[in-house]
Amino acid sequence: MDKNKDLLENEQFLRIQKLNASDAGKRQSILVDNEDELYGLTSSNNSCASEHEGEGEGEDERPATTSSAPTQNHSAGDVAFIPGKTAEEDTETVTKVVESDDQVFRTHVQTLSSKGKSRYRKGSSNFISFFDDMAFENRPSILDGSVNDPFKTKFVGPTLEKEIRKREKELMAMRKNLHHGKPAPDADAADAPALTTTTTTTTSATSPETVVTIETTILSSNFSGLYVAFWMAIAFGAVKALIDYYYQHNGSFKDSEILKFMTTNLSTVALIDLIMYLSTFFVVGIQYLCKWGVLNWSSTGWAFTSIYELLFVGFYMYLTENILKLHWLSKIFLFLHSLVLLMKMHSFAFYNGYLWGIKQELQFSKSALAKYKDSVNDPDVVDALEKSCEFCSFELNSQSLNDQTQKFPNNINVSNFFMFTMFPTLIYQIEYPRTKEIRWVYVLEKICAIFGTIFLMMIDAQILMHPVAMRALDVRNSEWTGILDRLLKWAGLLVDIVPGFIVMYILDFYLIWDAILNCVAELTRFGDRYFYGDWWNCVSWADFSRIWNIPVHKFLLRHVYHSSMSSFKLNKSQATLMTFFLSSVVHELAMYVIFKRLRFYLFFFQMLQVPLVALTNTKYMKDRTVIGNVIFWLGICMGPSVMCTLYLTF
């Protein structure tokens, strides 16, 4: 009976019982930094908690969180009370400590008690992993799956004329039979893959009572030839522009400003980029210290990691601007790459931080269950411990299904983090879908696409954009003659730069999200090539923000959207606003790196997407998808040009 009382009055067990209550439906997580003092328990040296992750990961829309039950013992995970005291005295001591620290306890409860996650799907006993918000699988990119691969494997030339002639013969035979009152032969639609038919009904001329079905053919064709013609036109246009520039500048390219930008300080940029990459392994060191029991993730590990992440971006911004004084092109490259590395560090660190909490709770639940299972009469107590063990075991085991040697915490090693940094993804997990081999011909195609696209971008920037940018700087540095005059000049610059920016936007997207990411994915045998969706068909900015950049969207979904719901008790709308706000701040920082001017134009346009999303969800716009797509493309064509000229002119 004393053991029953010990367990039922143990604060740690009461937390786990609440987390796993079948009628509660949510798994609450409460952290107090000085839990050891509050509960009068000592923490195991070989475990780290993970309460600060709070990342939502699940298809459920409720906020997600980490939750852990610290291992309260000196050895083997057994529950240990204050030495030299009976169970009754120990309970009284815990009560007094809690009462004396009541204000601290309440503060932590108010901050963290909202962190919760449903462990079971509604109406079933199936677990919901904290990482159910996304899944990786073997799949090609959209351009490869819809255009490139079919063109290379299925293109046979013109087929429409052959199918039309076949259908014409069938139609003439059908009409002839109808004229003589004979039944129409069945047309095999499968024999006409290039044609789509609609069905109408008529009556026989000789037998009005007979209803006859006639199929009307709608033409459809393969446009692969136009795909070839498009790139052919781009290539000839680029060659012509290159030749014209060559002769206009006395047979030399040395005067090209864009070429100078691209080739200045290459060795310095490469060295800084290497140092920046190597410095990301700091988070691996933090996880090693947690693994060895030197640091506790919940109290110090997460704090060291978060501070380092802020210093990481700030330091390299300061280094490139104030010390090295690099050109704007070098600065924006290093800044954007630092953001990529920052997101990778954060995902690796807080993924493992969450699993430290799960592992700790499993240790506590197993030890408590082994000690009290036969002596506790309350079935709810045993049920809570068993559910905790089941869920934590499921969560840990489901992270590494194919390679047990990388099972947490064995995944915390330099080689594992190195491979993650090589993969074209910002979301860390222990295993990813992989292809069987590297297609070196495919790699060569993508390398050619990379350098070819960069070549086109340089020509576009040199001929269509750079002259307009220089005129914009002249306008900014000219004598102020009034806002109206400045706006008129700005409007003229805007009209001139729009065509070049449209081309640059499309080429930039293709270069990064298709050519580079697919090349890296092939070299690392990374199977999931879903780097972007069909954003060109978007009818709202909400769709665009989700599918134009899938890797970043996944990161924001897990580490910002769900995390803000858990940590700051935000609802879905507030979490969405929070995500847009953070994204807008980062985009504005990018503009500061380029223009060295803090004007908040891009921040304003980014946040403007929020009311635009609400507008597209209205009854008037929801069913007008064509208008929505036209408005979307108007924004894509005008938006970058408007922002660039605003930063340059004002």
Swiss-Prot record:
Question: What does this protein do, in the record's words?
Answer: Sterol O-acyltransferase that catalyzes the formation of stery esters.
Region spans: Disordered: 41-79
Membrane topology per record = Multi-pass membrane protein
Motif interval(s): FYXDWWN motif: 531-537
Q: Name one GO cellular component term.
A: endoplasmic reticulum membrane
Q: Where is the composition biased (Polar residues)?
A: 64-75
Name the species this protein comes from.
Saccharomyces uvarum (strain ATCC 76518 / CBS 7001 / CLIB 283 / NBRC 10550 / MCYC 623 / NCYC 2669 / NRRL Y-11845)
Name of the protein described by the UniProt record: Sterol O-acyltransferase 2
Q: Cite the EC number.
A: 2.3.1.-
Q: Where are its TM segments located?
A: 223-243, 300-320, 412-432, 450-470, 493-513, 575-595, 630-650
Top EC group? transferase
Name the GO terms of the biological process aspect: ergosterol metabolic process
**Which Pfam families does the UniProt record give?**
MBOAT
Q: Which GO terms describe its molecular function?
A: ergosterol O-acyltransferase activity
Keyword Membrane among record annotations: yes
Question: Catalytic residues per the record?
Answer: H587
Q: Which UniProt keywords apply?
A: Acyltransferase, Endoplasmic reticulum, Membrane, Transferase, Transmembrane, Transmembrane helix
Q: Where in the cell is it found?
A: Endoplasmic reticulum membrane
Gene name tied to this protein: ARE2
Classify the main location.
endoplasmic reticulum
Its family remark reads:
Belongs to the membrane-bound acyltransferase family. Sterol o-acyltransferase subfamily.
